[in-house]
Amino acid sequence: MLTVGLIGAGRIGRVHASTISMHANSKLVAVADIIEDNAQKLASDFGGQVCTVDAIYKNKSIDAVLVASSTDTHSEIIEKATLAGKAVLCEKPVDISLVRAKQCLENTKPNGQPIMLGFNRRFDPNFVALKSELDAGGIGKAELLVITSFDPAPPPIDILKVSGGLFKDMMIHDFDMVNFLFEGLPKSIMVSASSVIDKKISELGDYDTAVATLK
């Protein structure tokens, strides 16, 4: 039985809590959130004891930490959780800053704990089947991949301020699919982006619509 401590009881935290509760070999034992009411409601719905983040680190009965808090907290939580001997599944991205993300990777290597990012599409049966067909040559040689993604609505502005925005929080899934299917990193990238839905997004220096070409 894998015991899990969940940090972050917002929308995606509830999705993860539901998944943990449905799996026969995992159990949610602790929940922490800066908004205690959110943590209390999640614990009431899916189990687990409401506690602090530090209490999750110190709890020796917890095998893994699932990080579903805001992006600006990810790298520090990853470092502290692995130092405490916990495996980590973290929502993407590791950090808004590439420098800080790389630093986090280096800082956690000595801790020897597995770390995984929430690139769930790699486990989607449709993408897995496509990957298998590509590897087997069943659909010929791949020369061009077109990915079109939509969100039902832009995220709240408060979330955009700390999430990483369109590229680091949302399109990151599409970039990862290119890496997954083609087994490599792009040599170059060109992007055309704009903000046409909500001018508040533009005021943040972010975008709601973009086309990216990776080579």
Where are these predicted regions, by residue range?
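N-terminal Rossmann-like dinucleotide-binding module
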Residues: M1-F46
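Rossmann-like dinucleotide-binding domain that binds NAD(P)(H)
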Residues: P155-K215
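Glycine-rich, N-terminal phosphate-binding loop of Rossmann-like dinucleotide-binding domains
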Residues: A68-S69, S149
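Beta-strand-loop-alpha-helix segment that lines the small-molecule cofactor/substrate pocket
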Residues: D63-A64, S70-T71, S75-F119
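Short acidic low-complexity segments
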Residues: Q49-K60
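Basic phosphate/pyrophosphate-binding loop/patch that engages nucleotide-derived ligands
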Residues: E106-P114, V128-A142
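Short, Asp-centered acidic motifs that coordinate Mg2+ and/or phosphate
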Residues: A30, A64, L144
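NAD(P)-dependent dehydrogenases' Rossmann-like dinucleotide-binding region
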Residues: I12, G118-R122, L134-P156, M170-D174, ...
